[in-house]
Amino acid sequence: INLLHVSVLNPLLSDSDSLRLIGEYYFRRGYYAEALELFERLSAAYHSDSEIYQKIGFCYQKKGDYANALEAFLKAEIISPDNFWTIRRIATCYRNMKKPEMALSYYHRAEKIQPENLSVQMNIGHCYVEQKDYEEALKYYFKVDYLDPEGGKAWRPIAWCSFLVGKKEQAQRYYEKILDDKPVSLDYFNAGHVEFSLGHIRKAIDYYRRSIELDNGDSAKFLSNFKQDAPDLISSGIAASDMPILLDQLMYGITDSL
């Protein structure tokens, strides 16, 4: 129940202190739509309160409304320009709005405030990937791996970016670490690409087969994903004419095992 919509209570709860108290209660409980209404009313009276705009932005973000969230966070930034939390939220909004260049500029600002924040480093890497600057992305993923060598957070992006820039042995090393840990279908799929590009056909087929098995035997999905990655495979040096030959061997083996 939104207490302000109860006609008897509305006059009693319309002062700023009551609005803020109720808004904070809704916010902490995760009732973001109700909290948003209250914080927006408060913002009309408190133009210089960055926390109100932060919470308005967060409520919009929880609704998936990144444009309005961004607008609120930018207002908070004007009031408090070096707030790490706000800067990260602005960057997140830009990423979700498919504006990696703008996101990157804010993540770099966040990086200056907290140089060893792993999440910021990862997101900088992701922004470079979205701009297809894989070499630059690798620098940040390697920094994450250096700061947290046992965490494995950056292994997958390091492996994939290494493959895309032609560092196949490096990609292979990282996929071996991933496959020794807790691999999912996509890990075997991508590791198969690396082995295929290195000319290790039997190993590639084995990895592709494992990928299909872990995806509930969905060979149609596998073929669709393989076709989507064909340009990257060709860029890695695989001849287009070799792809149908490998796929025939793979599918024959799968059919034969049924």
Region roles according to the model:
Residues 28, 62, 96, 130, ...:
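Register position in tetratricopeptide repeats
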Residues 43-44, 74-78, 108-112, 142-146, ...:
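Conserved structural position within tetratricopeptide repeats
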